[in-house]
Amino acid sequence: DKDESILLREYSPYKVDNKNIILFFHGGGYVLNSVFTHDDMVAYFSEKLRTRIFSLDYKLAPENKFPEALENAIQAVKWLEDKNISCENISLCGDSAGGHLAASLTHHFTNEDKKIHSQFLMYPMCDPNCDSESHKIFGDKYFLTNQAMKWFWKHLQKDEIDMTDEMFNLLLINKKITANHTFIITAGFDPLHDEAEKYASLLHNMNNN
């Protein structure tokens, strides 16, 4: 049911010193976690940044395949706009799968020629092929493994054609995005390291900030 309600939790700090808001998406490979698992993190960000944050409890795979979570995110932005929050004052943020969802939403708005304030991606999932050098080096020695990432992507993917969609495979982006700024954090001993670096390089080469 496309009209089914989804949870969007608001965090309001003791003091707000800007008119922007952050729309946050939690990580967990699109299969795990919720707004509740990331509650402390988002509350901390809100207080330290003195910024209102809305955290979205998007629908998880495998019951909800691509692009269900993206459609939830689009719905959340429409709700914020109905509350007189301009898209140009919205920063999209997320960790891992949440970073992928934030970037996917940026790509969606780029295709609609709609500007957003920024995107802030923490060790984002970017490439469903999972075959970068960092996947080979760090893919079986640390917390997140190459096999786990393949499992997450498999549960998210609906059809083979998804692999040709820039909102599924972020590395297919071939145009300047409409986010004013992009911030990307990578982790050193992480299978996702190289794909996030490559995504950053692609954006830089297309004159993104």
For the regions a protein language model found, what residue spans apply to each?
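Alpha/beta-hydrolase superfamily serine-hydrolase fold, recognizing
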Residues: K2-N209
